[in-house]
Amino acid sequence: MARIAGINIPDHKHTVIALTSIFGIGKTRSQSICASTGIAEHVKISELSEEQIEQLREAVAKFTVEGDLRREVTLSIKRLMDLGTYRGLRHRRGLPVRGQRTKTNARTRKGPRKPIKK
């Protein structure tokens, strides 16, 4: 297994799909990484040479991924909550942040139904 950005990349998958197992790299960014390094998208990770894997490591290192990205997202949410913005309050209360309705639906964000006590 190749190790890129601290993640074990699955050998049996194609390069484009395998790179998406890194947090912060989706399909589009994965395709652009393959294009910039000159590695074909349909080649499996196990078929790549050590030099090509090193090229992928360098290309991925240019982006904010994994732990740094998770930390950045967490800190930005915490900043919103500390400032007391509307979005921060919605995060704090565990409600939908982006304007979705909450009279019905929003069960994923609100959690399971709570019975009405008589």
Curated annotation (Swiss-Prot):
Q: InterPro entries, from UniProt?
A: Rbsml_uS13_C, Ribosomal_uS13, Ribosomal_uS13-like_H2TH, Ribosomal_uS13_bac-type, Ribosomal_uS13_CS
- Report the record's Gene Ontology biological process terms: translation
Provide this UniProt record's keywords sorted from A to Z. Answer: Ribonucleoprotein, Ribosomal protein, RNA-binding, rRNA-binding, tRNA-binding
Name of the protein this chain belongs to: Small ribosomal subunit protein uS13
SUPFAM superfamilies, per database record: S13-like H2TH domain
Q: Which family does it belong to?
A: Belongs to the universal ribosomal protein uS13 family.
Q: Where is this region: Disordered?
A: 91-118
The major lineage groups are: Bacteria, Pseudomonadati, Pseudomonadota, Gammaproteobacteria, Enterobacterales
List the PANTHER family: 30S RIBOSOMAL PROTEIN S13/40S RIBOSOMAL PROTEIN S18, SMALL RIBOSOMAL SUBUNIT PROTEIN US13M
GO terms assigned for molecular function = rRNA binding; structural constituent of ribosome; tRNA binding
Q: Does the keyword Methyltransferase apply?
A: no
Pfam families to which the protein is assigned, alphabetical: Ribosomal_S13 (PF00416)
Organism field: Serratia proteamaculans (strain 568)
Q: Under the cellular component aspect of Gene Ontology, which terms does the record hold?
A: cytosol; small ribosomal subunit
